Amino acid sequence: GALIGRHMDKVAEEAAAQVENAKVEEVTDANGLKAVKVTFDSGILFATNKADLNATSKNELAKFSTVLKNNADCHIDIYGHTDSTGNDGINIPLSNSRAKSVADYLKSCGVSNSQFQQITGKGSSEPVADNGTASGRQQNRRVEIYMYASQAMIDAANAGTLK
């Protein structure tokens, strides 16, 4: 666990250095290991009710793709989120489309398809702020990318060969 923790510390530092318009945090994955969570504000990524990436977003994601390519031993999950405006019939497909747009663009930048594990939308089910305010709704419209240890990284750590 300690080797993976140090490795993921480096991944977090690299992500923070490359990406200006996102929040980088260290979190714990399902295996109890350190992982990196990068949250992109959907206001930066998408126009309201749209899943098409704008030029600024593509620039940010292109920079971030370098981090993913440099850390090919990390698996990636991408989750799209919406605010509570509209119902699940609108928000779940929209959040799915946003997650897929981000994944497709990262793949077009050369990130390996094998790194992607989950690409899904959560609709408005996991708010991080109050949907009763404009600022809260803006915070809830986001895309989260999780980078975590692949089995290959865990095996390398156990074998003492993780760089």
Residue ranges, per PLM feature:
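Signal for well-folded cores of large energy- and translation-related assemblies
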Residues: 16, 20-23, 69, 107
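Extracytoplasmic
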Residues: 10, 19-21, 31-35, 39-41, ...
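N-terminal post-signal-peptidase region of extra-cytosolic proteins
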Residues: 20-23, 63, 102, 130
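Periplasmic OmpA-like peptidoglycan-binding domain that tethers envelope proteins to the cell wall
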Residues: 81-156
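Periplasmic peptidoglycan-binding/anchoring modules of Gram-negative envelope and division proteins
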Residues: 45-79, 107, 145-147, 152-163
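Short, low-complexity, glycine-enriched hydrophobic/amphipathic alpha-helices that associate
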Residues: 1-16
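Surface-exposed patches in mature extracellular/periplasmic domains of secreted proteins
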Residues: 24-28
